[in-house]
Amino acid sequence: MAAKGRMRRIIRTARSLPTALERLIVVLEHRYTPIARFRPGAFEGWGFLWQPAVLGFIALLLILAGSCFVESPFKLGLPRTWFFGAPPSLAATNLPTNETKLMIAISLTYGGLVLLLRVWMRLAEVVKLHAGAPDRVLYCIVALWSIPMLVAPPLFSRDVYSYAAQGEMTAHGISPYIMGPFSLGSSPFVDPVDPLWGNTPAPYGPLFLYLDGLIVRSTHHNQLMSTVGLRLLELAAVALLAYALPRLARALGRDGGEAIVLGALNPLVILTLIGGAHNDALMVALLVAGLMFAARRQLWLALLFCSLATAIKAPAALGLVYVAWTWLVPGANERVTRVREFPIVVVRMIRTRLRPLVAGAVMSTVTLLICTYLAGFGFGWVKNLATPGTVRSWAAPATALGMAITGLCHSVGLDVSMTPILSVTRLLGLLTAVGISIFLLWRAQTRGWVRSLGMSLLLFVVLGPVVQPWYLVWGLLVLAASYQGREHFWLLALSITSPFLGLPGAHDLLDGLVNAPLLLMAAALIVLMGALLVPLGRWTQWSWPEVDDRLERLGLTAE
């Protein structure tokens, strides 16, 4: 009984955490930001949208300006990797770093990032409380915010250079499933590749390799133009995402404008999928398009698009499972009231689902076979799916647990290897994600199958061997069209905090602020504090119609 009581208290505490966090945020914003002086007012229509559009554009221009410096730590500092902001020669990379330019670059980038997150969070709250934002205007904002990231060099990651090198390998008939980019020898495609992935085979699906090689061939094997082509491919994917998200949301009975803001305008999408040119954009865009068709009961198109998404990156296969499993004949769902009924109900449900499961398997198999034939390198990508796990990061809970256990053992004098411990903790994380995902799949019809899919994708990322900001978009973009209740808070929280995962330059910024000349220090602080505290405009009051009630419950007043 005592154990049951403790378990109930733990569950009660876990359920109260979102409320406690929300109250803490309300108190902090009331006391330390300009929101305290706003009084809720009547909503005056959507004419104000130009204000967040311009503010977000300015924020992204600050990030672009920060990337223009050769010293910027947010991009690759090698010659001929972009049209500007690159050193003139390889010898110039060995010159001493200009500390002044380094701090300016970091201050501009961090200031722009903070301002962008503030603008987006307020806009997300406005469209949540006032449905009906026009798609056409929001599409214009997506286009406007994309411009600085199209001009900027690839930011926050060097993965796009690996894509280009793998495309060059594909164009020359070298299998990226067997060899790494360093097999190209002295090719200009090799220099920008992160050494961590230089000898690592590709884990990407055959469709992406086919498109990758096609882009390299169409640019006549020019490394810089291949990088541009890959970014344009991801931009097209974001355009497809912006088209499919509101239609998926409306098919689920939700507001399409809010889905665009939470999805296509999400800072993670703008910064990592367009700015970083990650192929996750193509995968998740095809997946969301497939979910849109599934919500409209157009199963064959849904299976086709989900299969194409799987041929980009394997995690999209989870979408295939959900689409096939939830395509039901009438009366296919049954509830289990007694334990002995469980086998009977399982057999009955499998029979009713046999047709969609077989159809899904056939469609996905045929699509993958065609893509594999076009790429011409077989199914080697399947055995390479664990490649990202070579990274050891504290951002992944399963990996962090293994590293912490290893460190603890070393501190008490036990000489243990980290590799087997990491294997165990990562396996436990994977099994936990699989177990919860099976439960979500089983209850998909009652909990909302698109929402359950989004949660499953997030689980596999958070409990996986490595967590990257662009991995989180898999689940966040699906939840953008299907979330319920407090999931909105967690969606915002993940979107706002994850851009800072592994973001470089923080140490350099703090060191520069301590040691910089007084005038430069003052200028950097003005940029950073201005981005954090500058009033966004009176349109933000429409995102807080409930703020008075919440403050009263906390014993505060909105004066």
Regions found by a protein language model. Give the residues of each.
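Specific aromatic-rich, kink-prone transmembrane helix
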Residues: 240-244, 283-298, 457
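Perimembrane helix-loop-helix junctions
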Residues: 318-365
